[in-house]
From Swiss-Prot:
Belongs to the bromoviridae replication protein 1a family. One of its GO terms (molecular function) is mRNA methyltransferase activity. Interacts with RNA-directed RNA polymerase 2a. This is Replication protein 1a.
Length: 993
């Protein structure tokens, strides 16, 4: 390490503090410190603590989390047990920071018993298991609904389309799969083993959690956690304040070495000087986090590590490992720092001196009291006089004294009920010691027999004493009481852990798997970071959001599927194909399994969401009725899903059903399914078309196809539909599309009709093929294949028994994307056997070509190959793109000859409302206004892209969405926008063109 070439003291002495070198040194040091602080502020996450905290409480939270987070103590509102609530927020963020925060689907985190609204408002990739175990849980859910509604109403654009991710199932019953989990003060109701069983049900490997901790619970009936201002107390049951009066010896035996109790002991947590709601938890569950170390369950062994104990809060982690575990001695200690200065003293608890109890007294107080008692002891004095002397000394050492007008506490105040008995016990102890010392002196100065006995060797003395005691019991010396007990400051647990079930865990293969997965995910994140960096350099004033990035759907062909259900017996054939030596068969079987699991999870999520709403409204699984708070609950959910509604048994709907909407299923106490007009049931947007479970079942019943998959990867407008039309043979082919709109367009192009029997027979959607009877064909032609999951394409081929699939699509346009952010999607991308490119467009005008090239250069990561960098146009239209700013939706020029597209559903709804106000025909706002995603594959003469808001919208930064928007027209394209949107790719490219 380099050393300084000059002496600071000499420098200041010779040149003074105004010297140039001294000034430069001070400036340099100050600059380094300031730079360090700025770097901390930049990398530290801002955490706002609204609770009013005192000076000591503020120091507690800053000492614990001030180095990790940029804490802002705003002191806005008084809250019950404010420090505990503030710590809970920091604990949640701290535990989440232990896991990958990329936002990728495989990094979903579970929260056992947490607050789902906290994660919803912060945009965390977290699923909460929040069961309704009692009235308090239901109260919390109602309050969270209110908070969510209040915040959404203040900023609806930020939460547009975002759904709260939680369920009301107990953690062990929830089916959501994730590698990571947290439990913030949620383990009290589950215990260590309950958490391990919940982790096993979720396929969770690592859990991090927190809980209140006081080692004195191991032997005391009550105590205080001073930092949290919390008093805990053991009670017999949750409904009785009877103390746990078990003797100390029995208590130690039962709490440390035995798991069997004759009654159920609860621990009540009360916050001192706060008349607020307290908490009561099972002592057995709390004790398990102090005493247990490992737990083996269903082929997994789970171990707990106690990481940090600070301010009365213990942070722990539970890690599960598969396979065999050789025997190992695991040791841990529970320390009791609160009793290191105390000694135990036995005092009488009954007049006959049969029952005794142990009290704690300061060692210094007892030592000084006993010293004086021993010096002042006199056999000739009455015991009462000596008792008064001891009480006087004891009082002086444990009471408040006044010195020079200042009151001071001498020692520690003794309980008034124990004060007299402590003095009496010290008197008995003093008398016993004098008697023992007298006997020892007499033994030393004994008679001839005693001297002869003392002269014997030790074995002979022991033998002779035992014989005399056996023959003459009355000569046995009196048994004395042990008054003083040394209190141990810790308890040690030695547990031998071993597990011999299951197969050996191949750690090397697992390491290779994780590394490969991380590389793939890292490339996705690097591309996202590069894109953000480019935006930041172009727009240096743009604020970067702290929210996690959007989940990615990039596939990873080397990894298994996380989130799919365990394979059952009926899938043996498809499951076996995933291990086929033929690579493409294995890939297709794996993709089909993933697609089936994905559709099943969509169905389960729909059922879970509807059941949650049903329960929130007061419904249950037995009766067809709801409670009276319907409007509050449904108004709240309506802000995030405008299709939420109630159908009453009278046939009336709570809200008007949107025109053209027909709900195919509903949910009530009988579950999800078709309902009659005389039933009470609820619906949401997923109830219009609800076929996910059927698609999953059908896909699982099929086998992976062995035919050839060919893909024509062409630019927008390259004539894909024309090519399908030219090669279509009715005798051998069937045309399959990704959605209903594309099917109608192809039917019109081939048969000049969208609903004729012939058109509907030969042109069908992928869902229609899987759900309905259909003839077998030798070849299937697929339009817009990138909108299909690879597993669904394989299922279609298998259902049709096709030996060849010719797929048309643009790999750079909007691809299939998961509707469930919690599902770990890895095999959605089409894997063709043959690929051909088409880089000539016949639709897009000449001026669109350089615009798209510019967009690709700006939006795609450096080094990315794109066919749009060399595409050409055969269109005769040379100039087609224009843009103009508008103030509101009323200035949008709605013309029946134009086709209108938007990026968001909110803008689409605004355009439809405007069209209705202008009394335009239903066919116009039903068929001529679409989102960009809905318009993929559509070709129109005149297109208008409308943006009505300037709030952040990532879709305007994505090349695929901007590409689709800019390549739908043949003659003219007009971009009408409100305000300036930072990062608007289309506006920037039009301005530079």
């Amino acid at each position: 390490m380099a050393t300084s070439s000059f002496n600071i003291n000499e420098l200041v002495a010779s040149h003074g503090d105004k010297g140039l070198l001294a000034t430069a040194l001070v400036d340099k040091t100050a600059h380094e410190q300031l730079e360090e602080q700025l770097q901390h502020q930049r990398r530290g996450r801002k955490v706002y603590i609204r609770n009013v905290l005192g000076v000591k409480d503020s120091e507690v939270i800053r000492n614990r989390y001030g180095g990790k987070y940029d804490l802002h103590l705003t002191q806005q509102e008084f809250a019950p047990h404010g420090l505990a609530g503030a710590l809970r927020l920091c604990e949640t963020l701290d535990c989440l920071d232990s896991f990958p925060s990329s936002g990728l689907r495989q990094d979903l985190v579970l929260d056992f018993g947490g607050s789902w609204v906290t994660h919803y408002l912060r945009g965390h990739n977290v699923h909460c298991c929040s069961p309704c175990l009692g009235i308090r849980d239901k109260m919390r859910h109602a309050e969270r609904l209110m908070n969510m509604r209040k915040i959404i109403l203040n900023d609806p654009q930020q939460f547009d389309g975002r759904q709260p991710d939680f369920c009301t199932h107990p953690a062990a019953d929830c089916k959501v799969q994730a590698h990571f989990a947290i439990s913030i003060h949620g383990g009290y109701d589950m215990g260590f083993r309950g958490l391990c069983e919940a982790m096993n049900a979720h396929g969770t490997t690592i859990l991090k959690g927190t809980m209140m901790f006081d080692g004195a619970m191991m032997f005391d009936d009550q105590g205080v956690i001073p930092e949290l201002n919390c008093q805990w107390r053991k009670i017999r049951t949750a409904f009785s304040e009877t103390e746990d009066a078990t003797p100390l010896s029995e208590k130690l035996n039962s709490t440390i070495f035995s798991h069997v109790r004759k009654f159920k002991t609860m621990v009540a947590f009360d916050f001192i000087n706060e008349s607020t709601m307290s908490y009561v938890h099972d002592w057995e569950n709390i004790k398990s986090f102090l005493t247990d170390q490992t737990y083996s369950y269903r082929g997994m062994t789970y171990g707990i590590e106690r990481c940090v104990i600070h301010a009365g809060i213990m942070t722990y982690k539970i890690i599960g490992v598969p396979g065999m575990c050789p025997p190992e001695l695991i040791r841990h200690c529970i320390w009791f720092p609160s009793i290191k200065d105390y000694v135990g003293l036995k005092i009488p608890a009954s007049q006959d001196l049969v029952e005794w109890k142990t009290v704690r007294i300061l060692t210094s107080t007892l030592r000084e009291t006993e010293e004086i008692a021993m010096r002042c002891y006199n056999d000739k004095k009455a015991w009462m006089e000596q008792f008064k002397v001891i009480l006087g000394v004891l009082s002086a050492k444990s009471s408040t004294i006044v010195i020079n007008g200042m009151s001071m506490q001498s020692g520690e105040r003794i309980d008034i009920n124990d004060y007299h008995y402590i003095g009496f016990a010290i008197l008995l102890h003093t008398k016993m010691k004098y008697e023992q010392l007298g006997k020892m002196y007499d033994m030393w100065n004994a008679s001839y027999i005693s001297k002869w006995f003392a002269a014997l060797t030790r074995p002979l003395r022991v033998f002779f004493s035992s014989v005399v005691h056996a023959l003459f019991p009355t000569l046995r010396p009196r048994e004395e009481k042990e008054f003083l007990i040394k209190l141990s400051t810790f308890v040690t647990f030695n547990v031998e852990c071993s597990f011999d079930g299951g197969e050996e865990w191949d750690v090397i293969s697992s390491a290779a798997y994780v590394a490969t997965q991380a590389v793939t995910d890292g490339k996705v994140l690097a591309a996202q970071k590069a894109e953000k960096l480019a935006e930041k350099l172009a727009q240096p004033v743009i604020e970067v959001s702290d929210r996690p990035e959007a989940p990615s759907s990039t596939p990873d062909d080397t990894a298994d599927v996380c989130g799919k259900e365990q394979e059952v017996s009926e899938l043996d054939s498809l499951s076996a194909q995933t291990r086929s030596p033929i690579t493409r068969v294995a890939e297709r079987a794996t993709a089909m399994l993933e697609y089936a699991a994905y559709e099943k999870q969509l169905h389960d999520t729909t059922v879970s969401n509807l059941k949650r709403i049903w329960n929130m409204a007061g419904g249950d699984d037995k009766r067809n009725s709801l409670e009276g708070n319907l409007k509050f609950v449904f108004d709240t959910y309506f802000t995030v899903d405008p299709m939420v509604n109630i159908h009453f048994s009278t046939g009336r709907w709570m809200r008007p059903v949107p025109e053209g909407i027909v709900y195919s299923v509903g949910f009530n106490e009988r579950g999800l399914g078709p309902k009659s007009d005389g039933e009470l049931y609820i619906v949401n947007s997923e109830c219009v078309i609800c076929n996910s479970e059927s698609l999953s079942t059908v896909t699982r019943s099929l086998q992976a196809p062995t035919g050839t998959i060919s893909q024509v990867d062409g630019v927008a407008g390259c004539g894909k539909t024309t090519a399908i039309k030219s090669i279509f043979e009715p005798s051998t082919d069937m045309i399959v599309t990704a959605n209903k709109k594309s099917a109608q367009d192809v039917r019109m192009a081939l048969f000049k009709s969208s609903d004729s029997k012939e058109a509907c027979t030969f042109v069908r959607t992928a869902d229609s093929v899987l759900l309905n009877e259909c003839p077998t064909v030798s070849r299937v032609l697929v339009d817009e294949v990138v909108l299909l999951h690879f597993g669904q394409l394989c299922a279609v081929m298998s259902k049709l028994k096709a030996v060849r699939a010719i797929c048309f699509g643009d790999s750079e346009q909007i691809a299939f994307s998961s509707r469930d952010a919690s599902f770990d999607m890895r095999f959605s991308k089409i894997i063709p056997d043959e690929t051909s490119d088409a880089d000539t467009t016949f639709r897009s005008p000449q001026d669109v070509v350089p615009l798209v090239r510019l967009m690709a250069t700006k939006a795609l990561p450096k080094g990315t190959h794109s066919k749009y960098t060399k595409w050409v146009s055969q269109s005769k239209v040379k100039r087609s793109v224009t843009s103009r700013a508008i103030a509101s939706v009323t200035l949008v020029d709605l013309d029946s000859s134009r086709f209108y597209i938007t990026m968001t559903q909110a803008d689409k709804a605004s355009l439809i409302s405007r069209a209705k106000e202008m009394n335009l025909p239903k066919t116009f706002w039903n068929e001529r206004i679409k989102t960009v995603h809905e318009s993929q594959g559509i070709s129109e003469d005149h297109v208008t892209l409308v943006r009505l808001k300037s709030t952040k919208c990532d879709l305007f930064k994505q090349f695929s969405y901007c590409l689709v928007a800019l390549t739908r027209h043949k003659v003219t394209f007009r971009y009408e926008h409100c305000g300036v949107l930072n990062g608007d790719l289309i506006a920037e490219c039009i301005a530079r063109a």
